[in-house]
């Protein structure tokens, strides 16, 4: 099989709107939670989220692109632009059929759908609909628009597995290049879930933190007082490339995509398996796919969303797989970014890759007292980043429906 490497990175997120600022803020351990400004959330159980700040879409896209696309697709286009430019590959020097796009999203154009229903009701339920309504809502539109904008004519589809969507896309991109079906694939994830129906819906599930008096400390993964997750938004995009192709053109290589895997909990529509059975096997499959042993992994970027059930089951799963690895460090960066749903695996894979390139483990912020039920043999990095040599890093993502998506990266 072909080897696959990462040659480009791009991000739009609450922690930063380009890779440099994003990584700086992540390493610094800065919270990005604040009162929701996009709508009046005072009547909701949760009044806060991790919104993207200091960002003007017109600086990145033209008016027609903004008008015709849902916010999640706009985020994907902006992050893709940074990643593609970072990679530096030139389409005119290769076949357009050798470049594909595989993006993940959990909710797609959810905000567009919500607004159209609101307009429909406001117009007395008269059948007058925006002609862009349907394409704006489609979950595949991020991958479609990236290919249309840049002329990539290879493999193109979207992965939908809730909060595991980006890592599902990453696994697919890895395998298609391994199999010789593409030279380059633009991959990652995007979601824009900070809307009234989305916040209200997650409140109804009792999934979000209600710590309205202190939003900046609300997300506290693995802490004994955790009470739910912090909603985020944005996109992460990575350029995957066949190793020999990247070397031949003199590309900068961040890391190698070592392996990936997916399993299912087959347990519950929203809750993870309490003993982490699916997650355990998923991590084992990913290690096998990469040809690595558990004691070779230096860092796990945990899915850890700061929910009572999810964090505990994941900690048990990590301990079951890596319990004998005294070199392993674990951190939960959703404490800073919030939960980007279908984009979570993309930005967290970027964090894992940057941990490899820079030798830094970012912190889990806000966590003061680790839950005594969390296995004591796990080294969870809290409060501040640490310097550490990282040769292999793993990204965990788990989604509603029982989807477990795991990605492994290693130093070249």
Annotate each PLM feature.
Residues 3-7, 34, 213-290, 299:
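Condensing-enzyme catalytic core mediating Claisen C-C bond formation in acyl metabolism
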Residues 124-130, 171, 175, 192-248, ...:
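Glycine-/small-residue-rich "gating" segment that lines the acyl/pantetheine channel
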Residues 76-89, 139-142, 147-150, 156-191, ...:
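Active-site-proximal alpha-helical scaffold in enzymes
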Residues 181-227, 260-274, 304-311, 326-378:
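Acyl-CoA/ACP chain-elongation machinery
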């Amino acid at each position: 099989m072909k080897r696959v490497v990462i040659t480009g990175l791009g991000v739009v997120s609450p922690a930063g709107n380009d890779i440099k600022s994003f990584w700086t803020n992540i390493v610094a351990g800065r919270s990005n939670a604040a009162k929701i400004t996009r709508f009046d959330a005072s009547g909701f159980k949760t009044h806060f989220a991790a919104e993207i700040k200091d960002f003007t879409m017109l600086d990145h896209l033209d008016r027609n692109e903004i008008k015709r696309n849902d916010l999640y697709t706009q985020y994907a286009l902006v992050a893709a632009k940074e990643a593609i430019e970072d990679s530096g590959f030139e389409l005119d020097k290769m076949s357009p059929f050798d470049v594909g796009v595989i993006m993940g999203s959990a909710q797609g154009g959810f905000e567009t759908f919500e607004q159209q229903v609101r307009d429909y009701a406001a117009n007395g339920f008269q059948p007058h609909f925006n002609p862009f309504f349907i394409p704006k809502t489609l979950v595949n539109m991020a991958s479609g628009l990236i290919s249309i904008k840049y002329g990539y004519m290879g493999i193109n589809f979207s992965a939908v597995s809730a909060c595991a969507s980006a890592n599902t896309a990453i696994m697919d991109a890895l395998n298609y290049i391994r199999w010789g079906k593409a030279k380059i694939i633009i991959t990652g994830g995007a979601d824009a879930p900070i809307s009234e129906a989305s916040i209200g819906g997650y409140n109804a599930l009792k999934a979000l933190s209600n710590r309205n008096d202190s939003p900046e400390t609300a997300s506290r993964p693995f802490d004994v007082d955790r009470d739910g997750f912090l909603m985020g938004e944005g996109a992460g995009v990575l350029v995957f490339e066949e190793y020999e192709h990247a070397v031949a053109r003199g590309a900068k290589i961040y890391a190698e995509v070592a392996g990936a895997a997916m399993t299912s909990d087959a347990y519950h529509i929203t809750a993870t398996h309490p003993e982490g059975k699916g997650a355990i096997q998923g991590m084992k499959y990913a290690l096998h796919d990469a040809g690595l042993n558990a004691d070779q992994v230096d860092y796990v970027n945990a899915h850890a969303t700061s929910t009572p059930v999810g964090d505990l089951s994941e900690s048990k799963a990590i301990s079951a797989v890596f319990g004998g690895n005294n070199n392993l460090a674990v951190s939960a960066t959703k404490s800073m970014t919030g939960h980007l749903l279908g984009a979570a695996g993309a930005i967290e894979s970027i964090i894992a890759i940057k941990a490899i390139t820079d030798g830094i483990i970012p912190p889990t912020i806000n966590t003061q007292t680790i839950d005594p039920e969390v296995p004591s043999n796990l080294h969870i990095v809290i409060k501040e980043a640490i310097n550490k040599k990282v040769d292999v890093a793993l990204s965990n993502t788990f989604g509603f429906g029982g989807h477990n998506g795991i990605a492994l990266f290693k130093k070249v």
